[in-house]
Amino acid sequence: MRIIFMGSPEFSVVALSSILNNTEHKIVGVYTRVPKPAGRGKVLTKTPIHTVAEMHGLTVYTPKSLKRIEEQDRIKELNPDVIVVVAYGLIIPKEVLSIPKYGCINIHPSLLPRWRGAAPIHYAILHGDSQTGVTIMQMNEGWDEGDILLQKKLSIDEQDNIETLSSKLSNLGGAMLVEVLNNIDNLVPVAQNEDNATYTNKIEDFHIDINETAEVACRRIRALYPRAFVFFNGKRLRILQASYYYDDNISSLKPSSILNSGMHIKCKGNTILVPLVVQMEGKTLCSIKDFVCGYNVKDYSIT
């Protein structure tokens, strides 16, 4: 088949590589987001997909929108049998959805219809889900509402953070994509159950709420790794790894109380958050053991 691939972040790379390495299909074009300034030097930086595509000699397109007639005509000229979309970042208009013989298929890292939207992996961790998975669906004009072509489950380990779980789901999605492309004529699309639909939003708040339980705080640290933080005496302190426990003898203490020199933090109820790896703003990351050597932490406040 002739395939157009649309993707941008690191999560998309395994899917593109799986087509290149494990199928006989031909990629006739790769669409990705335009290069953007990044880092302190604001150097114009290509997306991971852009870099990988060029390494394989593939033609790369970086339109700012697919709504323009000129862009749609170019896709028609490429004559794809199918368009594969993996975290592309642009809206696919109905005019593009209808171009390929097999339409547009999308790899979505959740067990649809659970966790539609922009942050399904984050939400699975935040909500304490014991499992998630990958859904490959036939795209329509809705928000992750297309019929399911293939779906597989994946257990979430208690220590998984957004990086480790994303990697596992990316690998699973790549293998599933090969299966779908090689059997596309034999697949029977299954409609999603709208009664079970849940939705996610882009996450912009990375603050850890100490007034929640320590278990919820730990989920937040894992889901927002490595950006979750508390304020330590007014300065941002990132917590990159933590554990928690219960203590029935601390019910009289208010949340945010620092219990000992190891910086165990009282949270909601009788739960205690134990930071393990931290990073003070402007400093390098370190173990909590090294961090507390520089502070008498019980004299400081956590918010």
Swiss-Prot record:
Residues spanning the membrane: none
Protein name: Methionyl-tRNA formyltransferase
Binding-site residues for (6S)-5,6,7,8-tetrahydrofolate, renumbered to this chain: 110-113
Disulfide linkage: none
General function of this protein: Attaches a formyl group to the free amino group of methionyl-tRNA(fMet). The formyl group appears to play a dual role in the initiator identity of N-formylmethionyl-tRNA by promoting its recognition by IF2 and preventing the misappropriation of this tRNA by the elongation apparatus.
Gene3D superfamilies associated with the record: 3.40.50.12230
Family: Belongs to the Fmt family.
Any Pfam family matching the protein: Formyl_trans_C
Catalytic activity, reaction form: L-methionyl-tRNA(fMet) + (6R)-10-formyltetrahydrofolate = N-formyl-L-methionyl-tRNA(fMet) + (6S)-5,6,7,8-tetrahydrofolate + H(+)
InterPro entries registered for this protein in UniProt: Fmt (IPR005794), Formyl_trans_C (IPR005793), Formyl_transf_N (IPR002376), Formyl_transf_N_sf (IPR036477), Formyl_transferase-like_C_sf (IPR011034), Met-tRNA-FMT_C (IPR044135), Met-tRNA-FMT_N (IPR041711)
Gene Ontology molecular function terms on file: methionyl-tRNA formyltransferase activity
